[in-house]
Amino acid sequence: MTIGEACKMRIEQLCLERNITLNKLAIISGITQSTLNNIISGRNKSTTVSTIKKICDGLEISVLEFFSAEIFNDLEQEIV
């Protein structure tokens, strides 16, 4: 699994846990719906740290909490 796929899955997981839609997440995070849709659809292969930080702020969690999920433990090495 790539970091992009893991971020997508983590965002979806957090939305499910909090019972919020992706549209609501975009609004409370201050990012555009299209940016979030690109992350979730996989069109955005490398989400920026600043976008993840905005999502974390919207969810009222730390970046550390976002990345502490087990899904990030066994990522593939990505060489560009």
Positions of the model-derived regions?
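Short, basic-rich loop-to-helix N-cap that marks the start of a DNA-contacting helix
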Residues: 43-57
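The alpha-helix within a helix-turn-helix
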Residues: 15, 26, 56
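Residues within the helices of the helix-turn-helix
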Residues: 12, 23, 53
